């Protein structure tokens, strides 16, 4: 009975001797009074404040800094030199939203909308509010908090116009009114159709671009009050016109297309990118859009099989090599960016990949801002989220060290003042070898990993004894079994961790008698480093233009050239002439003739024995475009190939090798009236805008016959 009473006393003594005592049966605190975090290194937007204190109350930051007064009756956490950073803000997620499936999909075409009283196209869902279909998901919230996020902005990821998103705090044991930060936080757009509806149009990227254009024009017209009918989708679009606007572009060329739409309608889209922004950085820097960047870097390929190695493309290898430098390149080009966890499959990969980006040159301050200040500002929440600042929400993470050190772990994530323990930690490292005298015998207690999942070994002389250990908030509870005394003989200890090498407490010895003890470690254990499998930053290969096979290390520049003694095929009345000279400058022919004097600044090329002809013009081509057909309507005259030029298409290179210099890229023959064509110069390695002929006459594709009837399709 005495053993049971004393053990109960020890346990209760341990509970009421902690820094806090409101709850002890879970990982979250329900404390609404002042809470202080002392001996912390606090990261602020102005730098790290060492040996400082953070005070929070009722879900908000009250004060922070060195030598600040701590109010009476404050719960105090001594962080022992750990770090505090603002919790991260996720701008792109579908947290709490069920993914839609097209359960009633039909192979037959649907040309008319199914929603009466709404927009003429079912894929415009501007009236949809994601919060109406939201259910808090504890499992997903736990994953997000482990990556460092405290707040998520969630949308449905469905439709060309996806409606509005919402913003919630990731707190498990609260109701929705407490979690909710914004029930309508932003509008979302994409180039992808809804999975919920079967309407055929659009079925191409250029169709989606045309649909978005038409939507904005229709909304402008509708807002003038001249419509005789009510359109609930347009009314929602107009009502939400002042919300931040996000665009899920994804594919790298679609990022440029979304940015162009943003400029065209004087909108400031925050655009979700592909992670390959470095490949079209020349175009991106001409716009002023913030880019949401995934960091799901590709894993290294297994190259042990020489047969499979042949399947690897230069594009795949370059992506693996260059992707970690993407954020650095964006920063160097003054392009604002937000880091997203979208695409991350393992929670551990998020911080690991972020650290990889830092090793590849990303500025640490910019890295933190891309997770905190910038996403908060993009959601119009810059006055309450993303900083350690007075009156801001008490959203912060506690880490074991500087965030970007390889060994650092996120220990806790506090969201609106609610504690979530990620990595249970004892703040004092008391690893070492201790000696305790029990019943006249010395027992060696060897403790390791005391700041994580503690390990203990007990030895008497050279004999290892069985033991059981638990650690609760600086209190060590230990049971020692000494079978050499008696099979039923055991001693129990309750020890307070005083410092890094001292423990003291009360115990019950093998004779069931009480005793006090205090012991100091006589040997500090060295922590084994083990094998570090993390890779340092590899050398990043140089970009080519385009960044594919046969890409150029430098974009060709226009030169002034004098070709001498060539055979010219003039395609004029002059016919074919031999031993002629030709001068070109600024991309145009300046002069042809015999024995022309070389002007100053011209490069001379001896073309003796060579033939020079005009470049071949291909009037009917379907190359170098991301989409060719928009078959969702019988007439798709509103779409344009110019919106979907693909400058990376290797067919540009191949056609140049065959003498082709100009092509007209036509819409396909999916419908009687197709889309507008594009006439381009085959400039391999150039930006899209540099490929268009200025002032070229517009053309459109019409078609008849088997393709249009679709008689041989499917």
Where are these regions (language model features)?
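Histidine-rich, glycine-flanked metal-binding segment
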Residues: 19-22, 27-33, 46-87, 102, ...
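Acidic, glycine-enriched loop/beta-strand segments at the rims
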Residues: 23-31, 42-53, 66, 348, ...
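His/Asp/Glu-enriched, well-ordered alpha-helical/loop segment
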Residues: 25, 108-119, 127, 294-399, ...
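Tryptophan-anchored aromatic micro-motifs
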Residues: 37-41, 425-446, 452-461, 467, ...
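Active-site core of metal-dependent hydrolases
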Residues: 51, 155, 228-323, 337-338, ...
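Beta-sheet ligand-binding and adhesion/scaffold domains
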Residues: 92, 437-444, 475-547
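Polyanionic/metal-chelating signatures
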Residues: 137-277, 409, 415, 496-502, ...
């Amino acid at each position: 009975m005495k053993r049971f009473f004393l053990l109960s006393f020890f346990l209760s003594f341990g509970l009421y001797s902690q820094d806090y005592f409101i709850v002890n049966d879970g990982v979250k605190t329900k404390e609404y009074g002042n809470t202080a975090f002392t001996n912390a290194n606090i990261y602020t937007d102005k730098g790290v404040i060492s040996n400082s204190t953070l005070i929070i109350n009722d879900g908000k930051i009250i004060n922070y800094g060195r030598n600040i007064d701590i109010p009476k009756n404050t719960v105090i956490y001594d962080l022992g030199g750990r770090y505090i950073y603002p919790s991260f803000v996720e701008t792109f997620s579908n947290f709490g939203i069920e993914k839609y499936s097209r359960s009633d999909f039909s192979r037959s075409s649907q040309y008319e909308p199914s929603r009466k009283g709404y927009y003429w196209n079912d894929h415009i869902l501007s009236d949809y509010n994601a919060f109406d279909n939201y259910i808090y998901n504890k499992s997903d919230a736990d994953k997000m908090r482990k990556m460092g996020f405290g707040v998520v902005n969630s949308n449905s990821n469905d439709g060309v116009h996806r409606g509005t998103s919402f913003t919630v705090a990731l707190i498990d044991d609260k109701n929705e009114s407490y979690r909710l930060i914004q029930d309508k936080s932003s509008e979302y757009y994409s180039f992808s159709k809804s999975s919920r509806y079967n309407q055929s149009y659009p079925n191409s990227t250029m169709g989606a671009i045309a649909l978005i254009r038409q939507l904005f024009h229709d909304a402008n017209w509708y807002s003038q009050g001249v419509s005789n009918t009510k359109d609930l989708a347009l009314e929602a679009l107009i009502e939400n016109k002042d919300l931040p606007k996000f665009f899920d572009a994804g594919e790298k060329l679609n990022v440029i297309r979304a940015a162009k739409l943003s400029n065209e309608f004087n909108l400031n889209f925050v655009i979700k990118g592909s992670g390959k922004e470095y490949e079209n950085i020349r175009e991106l820097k001409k716009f002023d859009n913030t880019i949401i960047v995934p960091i799901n870097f590709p894993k290294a390929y297994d190259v042990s099989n020489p047969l499979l190695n042949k399947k690897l493309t230069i594009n795949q290898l370059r992506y693996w090599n260059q992707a970690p430098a993407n954020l650095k390149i964006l920063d160097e080009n003054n392009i604002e960016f937000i880091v997203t966890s979208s695409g991350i499959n393992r929670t551990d990969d998020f911080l690991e990949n972020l650290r990889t980006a830092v090793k590849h040159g990303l500025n640490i301050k910019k890295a933190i801002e891309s997770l905190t200040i910038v996403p908060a500002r993009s959601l119009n929440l810059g006055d309450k989220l993303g900083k350690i600042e007075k009156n801001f929400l008490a959203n912060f993470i506690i880490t074991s060290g500087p965030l970007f050190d390889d060994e650092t772990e996120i220990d806790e994530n506090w969201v609106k003042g609610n504690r979530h323990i990620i990595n249970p930690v004892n703040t004092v490292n008391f690893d070492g070898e201790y000696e305790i005298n029990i019943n006249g015998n010395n027992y060696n207690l060897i403790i390791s990993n005391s700041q994580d999942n503690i390990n203990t070994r007990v030895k008497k002389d050279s004999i290892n004894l069985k033991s059981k250990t638990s650690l609760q908030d600086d209190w060590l509870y230990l049971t020692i079994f000494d079978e050499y005394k008696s099979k039923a003989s055991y001693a129990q200890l309750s020890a307070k961790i005083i410092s890094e090498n001292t423990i003291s407490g009360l115990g019950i010895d093998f004779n069931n008698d009480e005793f006090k003890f205090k012991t100091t470690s006589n040997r500090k254990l060295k922590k084994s480093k083990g094998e570090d499998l993390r890779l340092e930053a590899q050398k990043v290969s140089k970009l080519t233009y385009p960044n594919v096979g046969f890409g150029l290390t430098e974009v060709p520049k226009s030169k002034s050239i004098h070709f001498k003694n060539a055979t010219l095929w003039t395609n004029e009345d002059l016919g074919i002439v031999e031993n002629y000279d030709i001068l070109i400058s600024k991309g145009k022919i300046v002069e042809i003739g015999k024995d022309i004097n070389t002007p100053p600044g011209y490069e001379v090329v001896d073309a003796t024995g060579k033939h020079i002809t005009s470049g071949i013009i291909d009037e009917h081509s379907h190359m170098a475009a991301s989409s060719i057909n928009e078959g969702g309507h019988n007439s798709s005259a509103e779409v344009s190939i110019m919106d979907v030029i693909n400058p990376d298409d290797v067919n540009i290179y191949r056609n140049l090798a065959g003498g082709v210099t100009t092509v007209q890229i036509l819409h396909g023959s999916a419908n009687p009236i197709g889309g507008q064509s594009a006439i381009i110069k085959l400039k391999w390695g150039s930006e899209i805008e540099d490929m268009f002929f200025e002032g070229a006459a517009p053309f459109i594709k019409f078609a008849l016959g088997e393709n249009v009837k679709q008689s041989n399709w499917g």
